[in-house]
């Protein structure tokens, strides 16, 4: 059985597509690594790339991406709405299949040490890979951002890195590497440019200040769109789903005469999270994920993916036809028609 992990490196560049292309090219050139998604945001001046593959291959891709970011990004000239301490700011490893969170911790520690060895970029470990309890939360590591950390590392032992010298790389800063469960980056945009309203809402909904469990949030100003945004990380969407967070943001916004005008998901999201949201807002009675066509087809195909790399289903035709021919109620005529049409 293949061992699969995900890595979601965040880079402090969201305005120069050529630089992001070069970073992605460095990572995608590693055999066995798949670039599943890339997001750029000019206001945040940040890119989020989603990689998946076998652990060693993904680790090497993350290392090469860090090296290319070090070449191309100068934090002394960087501005953006999102907090950052490094050119290759954050690199979490997430278990997918045949891999435990402990495996990802070991991989994160290995990658962190190798980043220092290759590039002389100091390393902080966070989440499950944290070496100190106060560094479990990323916001504690990023406090003061690049500029503040640059000064504090020289004189404050509590702000010194887990790996490397107590001195930031002059242009690439530091990198924060960790291991965690799947996280949903979910942002809600408001019909106001008043950042203080977004900050108040963020404070009300985040767990650290008495809000919803498994929620981290902050207010962000989107100058290019003349909007304020509540930027949210959901660390356990099954316990605190997206729809619950959206409804609380909406309720809190009403207190200040504001309202959501849209929301966005940054990166990838589990299908189950969207099913839960649809179930809630449509008020479906006795809904089961088995009613979703793609879920039923995947079951019939023995868990095979719904699409090949080229987006076609041709490679799955034989097991599907065998399932249709079997003496069972599903998949039925409607499913067969849908498959044929594809």
Question: What would you call each of these model-derived segments?
Answer:
Residues 1-322, 326-327:
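Long, contiguous binding/interaction regions
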Residues 325-342:
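Glycine/serine-rich anion-binding loops at beta->alpha junctions
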